[in-house]
Amino acid sequence: MTYSGDFIRRTRNPITHQSLLNRRLAMPHFLGMALLIGVMTGSAYATDNQQPQQRKTIQKPTPAIHDVHNGDVPSPSVAPEYKLQTVSREGVEYIEKLRKGTPFGTTDFNLEGLRAGMGTRNEPHLEGVKLIRLKIGDIPCEWVLAPGADPDVRLLYLHGGGWVSGSGGNYLPLAVDISVAAKCAVLLPDYRLAPEHRFPAGLEDCIAAHEWMVANGPSGPCPAKATFIAGDSAGGNLTLATLLALRDRKRTLPAGGIAISAATDFTLASESLRTIHDPIISARTMPEFRDRYLDKTDPRNPLASPVFGDYRGIPPLLIQVGEHEMLRDDSVRVAKKAVSDGIPVKLEVWPGMVHVFHIRGLPESREAIEHIAEFMSACAYPARAHAPSIHSSAAVPQRFCRRTTWKVRRAPRCR
C-alpha cells in the first residue's frame, strides 16, 4: 500500500449565493461549554436531532493544497493575514463575533472556572443513542453508540481541556456526531488531570483504555474489527503520545489516529504562537498548562511533545487544524515530521477556522467530521473504497489531486 505524502487542504463544491439564501440550516439545540486547548469561551456547539444535513456552502478561492515534497506547506514563520476565508455564512458570522470578545487567559488563568465549565455534562439530543457508563480499572469511561453504529469498530476519543480540565461527559454531542458519521462506537475516558496527577498519569490512562478497548466493546468482551484513537487540543497531544507509547511497548496499534487542533510542542517554538491572534485562547495560557502538566519533565520528551517523536511504525494519521488558531504550526510541524518518517499523513488546514471548530455546529464542523468518517472507513474497510477522495477545483492544481490507499490491520468478528 502506498501514500502520496501530500498535505491536503480540502475545498468544497461551489453553490450559488442565492441557493444558500434559499436553504434553511439546522439550528443549534444547545450551547456548548467554554473551550480552550479544548475549551472555547462564549461559543456554541450545535447538535441536530436528525442526521447531519447536506452541506450548504459558498465557494471562495483558497490557496492551493500544499505538497510536502515541494516544501511549500504553510510556512510556520508567516502569519496569515486575517481575512474571512470561511466558506459558509455561519462561519463568517461566528468568527466575526469571536473577534469582538477576549480570548481565554488574556488577563488571568482561572483553573476553577475552567474546570467548572469543562466538567459540565452535555446530554446528546439524538433519539436512540446508547450511553453506557463503566470503569476500566479506576478510569471512569462512557460508551457512545448511535443507531446503526457498528460496536466492533471502536474509537477512543480523548477530550481537550489543557491537561487540567475536561470530561468525557462534556464531549457527548461530538461523540454522537462522530458515531453517526463513522458508524462506530466511541469510548470517552476521564483520564487523570494535572496538577493533581502530572505527566504521565493521564497518558497511562489513555494507553490502558485503548488496550482494554481492543478486546472489549459496548456489549462486553469481544475483539474489535478495527480501533482508532482521536482527540482534540490536549487530547490531540495525548492521541499522538498514546500512539508512540503503544508502538514503543509493542502493544496492539489502532488502524489510524486522528489529531484535532493538537498541541504538540511544550518548548513553545511554533511561530504561530506569536504571529496568530487566536480569538479563542491567549498564548499566555500555554506556559500555565505546561507547568501544571509537566512539572519538571523535559518538554522535549516525545511523549509530552509529540513533535519530537519518531513516527516510524505508527499507523496512518489524519491531522485537522484551523488556519487561524495559534496551534496551527504545531499540527503542520508534527505532520511534516511523520511524513519524513515515512508515515501516511493527511493534513487538513481549514481556511478561516479556529481552535477545535468541530464543536461549533458550523457547516465546516459537519464536513470535518465527515472527513474523519471517510478516513476511518478507508482504514477499516480498504476493500470497500479508496482512501478519502480529493476534490479538485479551479483553486486546486490537478498535480495535487491524488488518491491514497491505507495500510489496515483486521481483527476477527465476534460470534
What are these regions (language model features)?
Residues 214-228, 249:
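Gly/Ser-rich "nucleophile elbow"/oxyanion-hole loop immediately N-terminal to the catalytic nucleophile
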Residues 353-363:
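Catalytic histidine-centered segment of alpha/beta-hydrolase-like enzymes
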Residues 244-297, 313:
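Hydrolase active-site cap/lid region
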Residues 362-390:
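Catalytic active-site module of serine/aspartate enzymes centered on a nucleophile-bearing elbow/loop
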Residues 47-144, 384-389:
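A glycine/proline-hinged amphipathic helix-loop "lid/cap" segment
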Residues 169-187:
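Short amphipathic alpha-helix adjacent to the substrate-entry channel of hydrolases
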Residues 319-321:
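Short beta-strand/loop motif that positions the catalytic acidic residue
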Residues 197-217:
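Alpha/beta-hydrolase active-site loop
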